[in-house]
């Protein structure tokens, strides 16, 4: 349980609130991959999901709790409404974690009470107290959120928080659910809580905010100045609607402006002690991983991690930066994991140089993964003169994200043009070693390839997302393809990278189908959940 008030606690909700971004659905393996990277990044708490929302969410939270929530690792958190069924599901899913937290919430604004909950203030007070106490029977660490706190009556909010803390809440989280407040208002709200909740010193004050007015990060910084010590944020700021407060922006604000923020933590301005536990050199890699797995591209002018964040086009700026970086840059690109000395590899580079560079970039791979990635590297080197760090990241990320190779693409060939019908031929090796060839006609080359693959694999599915991103500049750049298919309500994703977009598209599609086929082979394991568990629930905090 985290009780420190002398630093900022980073609570990452990429896997819960971030995944509620339209089109950002992740499967269990992808969530686990991100959770592992968040642990390396140094986040204090990972909100791994909403266990009662679906069987898939339950499985993901349980697996992350078991594999990432080890001794010395982050606290693993599960979201739950203030109902016994929700809290019971969260408690069961979190059981394997060394440090577990249940995060339970109920709305407190008058508009939510009247139209959503249809309950009185007295009823909400009773429910909050009772359900926090129930959550304490599963874990010692309980977080309580009054949903839509930003629009709640302050006096009622103080009462709810006092009751929740008295019932055992160790963290009270103040959400600006609809991104409505301004920094001055949000800072005042936190200050009011510090001054008017009698037992507030028994809990950590946390904040959660959305970016509907573009003020989430500014609101959080003001909240910290007024006593908040936990910040709920997401990588790249992904989340519902306009997103959440961006982890990388908050962390680097405390890193760059440490002298300004130190006094608010009772430190002398010149103190060099970091204000967070984040290893900032993992920020860029984490951003790229989340972008790749969710298929949500980072806008070029995004603060900290955007492609243009350290770019200078103005001649005056370029001249200044060349003479001294501090003239126009307030932080070192290396501090977030970007390197100035990009080592360029080529077809004459050997396995040792390849492996050494991967280690320098922070990748920890098994011998088998290195061998597979090296084969991809040599294949790429025959097509591309210079291979950059970004290319290497793409190769490795595509390799480590691959499922068991049940179906293997041996050949893909397409014919298309403005006066011909797109046609594709594929040769696929099946799980029993047989090579099958088929062809199909489509509305475009990718459609034709997918139809040909479907004829061989013969697993019913709906393609729900297809996205392509260029890794580097240039006509010979690698293209990363992310696709998602749906089968019986479940979503399966595939990723691939290649200088040939058609090949990458075929490999990504087959990757998703391999995941789907593997699940069909082993069957979906049944989980002991409450009988009335729904297929899907949308969280509101």
From Swiss-Prot:
Mn(2+) binds at residues 17, 208, 210, 244. Pathway: Amino-acid biosynthesis; L-leucine biosynthesis; L-leucine from 3-methyl-2-oxobutanoate: step 1/4. Residues 408-541 are annotated as: Regulatory domain. It is an enzyme of class 2 (transferase). It comes from Trichodesmium erythraeum (strain IMS101). Residues 8-284 form the Pyruvate carboxyltransferase domain. InterPro entries: 2-IPM_HCS-like, 2-isopropylmalate_synth_dimer, AIPM/Hcit_synth_CS, Aldolase_TIM, LeuA/HCS_post-cat, LeuA_allosteric_dom_sf, LeuA_bact_synth, PYR_CT. Its EC number is 2.3.3.13. SUPFAM superfamilies: 2-isopropylmalate synthase LeuA, allosteric (dimerisation) domain (SSF110921), Aldolase (SSF51569). Keywords: Amino-acid biosynthesis, Branched-chain amino acid biosynthesis, Cytoplasm, Leucine biosynthesis, Manganese, Metal-binding, Transferase. Homodimer. This is 2-isopropylmalate synthase.
């Amino acid at each position: 349980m985290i009780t420190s008030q002398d630093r900022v606690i980073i609570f990452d909700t990429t896997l819960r609130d971030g995944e509620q971004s339209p089109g950002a659905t992740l499967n269990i393996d992808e969530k686990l991959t991100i959770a592992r990277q968040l642990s390396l990044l140094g986040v204090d708490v990972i909100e791994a999901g909403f266990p009662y929302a679906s069987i898939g969410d339950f499985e993901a939270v349980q697996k992350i709790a078991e594999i990432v929530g080890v001794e010395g690792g982050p606290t693993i958190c599960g979201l739950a409404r203030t109902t016994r069924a929700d809290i019971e599901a969260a408690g069961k899913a979190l059981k394997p974690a060394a440090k577990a937290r249940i995060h339970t919430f109920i709305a407190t604004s008058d508009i939510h009470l009247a139209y959503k909950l249809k309950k009185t203030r007295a009823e909400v007070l009773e429910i909050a107290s009772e359900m926090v106490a129930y959550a304490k029977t599963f874990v010692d660490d309980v977080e309580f959120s009054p949903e839509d706190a930003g629009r709640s009556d302050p006096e009622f909010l103080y009462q709810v928080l006092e009751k929740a803390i008295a019932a055992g809440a160790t963290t009270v989280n103040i959400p600006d659910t609809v991104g409505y407040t301004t920094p001055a208002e949000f800072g005042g709200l936190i200050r009011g809580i510090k001054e008017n909740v009698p037992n507030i010193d028994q809990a950590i004050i946390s904040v959660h905010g959305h970016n509907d007015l573009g003020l989430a990060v500014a609101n959080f910084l003001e909240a910290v100045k007024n006593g908040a010590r936990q910040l709920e944020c997401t990588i790249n700021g992904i989340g519902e609607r306009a997103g959440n407060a961006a982890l990388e922006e908050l962390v680097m604000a405390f890193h760059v402006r440490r002298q300004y923020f130190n006094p608010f933590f009772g430190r002398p301005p010149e103190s060099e002690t970091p204000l967070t536990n984040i290893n900032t050199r993992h920020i860029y890699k984490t951003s790229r991983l989340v972008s790749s797995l969710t298929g949500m591209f980072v806008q070029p002018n995004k603060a900290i991690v955007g492609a243009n964040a350290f770019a200078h086009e103005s001649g005056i700026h370029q001249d200044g930066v060349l003479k001294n970086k501090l003239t126009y840059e307030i932080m070192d690109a290396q501090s977030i994991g970007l390197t100035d000395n990009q080592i360029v590899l080529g077809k004459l580079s050997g396995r040792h140089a390849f492996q050494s560079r991967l280690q320098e970039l922070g990748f920890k791979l098994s011998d088998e993964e290195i061998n597979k990635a090296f084969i991809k590297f040599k294949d790429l080197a025959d097509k591309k003169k210079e291979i950059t760090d970004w290319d290497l990241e793409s190769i490795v990320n595509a390799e480590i994200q691959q499922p068991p190779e049940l179906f293997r693409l041996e050949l893909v060939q397409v014919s298309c043009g403005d006066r011909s019908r797109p046609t594709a031929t594929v040769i696929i090796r099946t799980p029993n070693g047989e090579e099958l060839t088929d062809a199909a006609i489509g509305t475009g080359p990718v459609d034709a390839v997918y139809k040909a693959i479907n004829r061989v694999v013969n697993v019913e599915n709906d393609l729900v997302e297809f996205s392509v991103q260029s890794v580097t500049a240039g006509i010979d750049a690698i293209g990363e393809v992310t696709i998602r298919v749906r089968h019986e309500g479940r979503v399966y994703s595939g990723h691939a990278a290649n200088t040939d977009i058609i090949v990458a598209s075929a490999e990504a599609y087959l990757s998703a189908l391999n995941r789907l086929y593997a699940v069909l082979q082993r069957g979906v394991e049944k989980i002991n959940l409450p009988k009335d568990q729904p297929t899907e629930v949308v969280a509101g905090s």
